[in-house]
């Protein structure tokens, strides 16, 4: 089991995301629960980012929406960085 660490930025973007996309609230909550259990589950589509975002990972909520994060495997922590559309998260 991993501990989810909510950054201030993630907290703001998660609230905005939930307000704008009420239809995805349940899916978003389920993704966070699944991340806590095992971030490497295939349906999360966990992947490493490159370029200016090297060192950051992401998981998919849907084809259009992502959560960016950093996984500290030794500490069993997942540091949540941002949530939003593909373009918002990868800016």
Predicted regions and their residues:
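Residues forming the ATP-binding cleft of Hanks-type serine/threonine protein kinase domains
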Residues: 84
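Basic, Lys/Arg-enriched alpha-helical interface segments
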Residues: 1-65, 72-79, 88-91
């Amino acid at each position: 089991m991993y501990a989810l660490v909510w950054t201030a930025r993630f907290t703001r973007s998660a609230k905005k995301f939930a307000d704008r996309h009420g239809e995805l609230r349940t899916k978003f909550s389920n993704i966070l629960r699944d991340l806590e259990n095992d971030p490497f589950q295939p349906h999360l589509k966990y992947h490493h980012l490159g370029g200016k975002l090297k060192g950051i990972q992401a998981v998919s909520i849907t084809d259009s929406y992502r959560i960016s994060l950093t996984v500290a495997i030794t500490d069993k922590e997942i540091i949540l960085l941002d949530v939003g559309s593909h373009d918002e998260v990868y800016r």
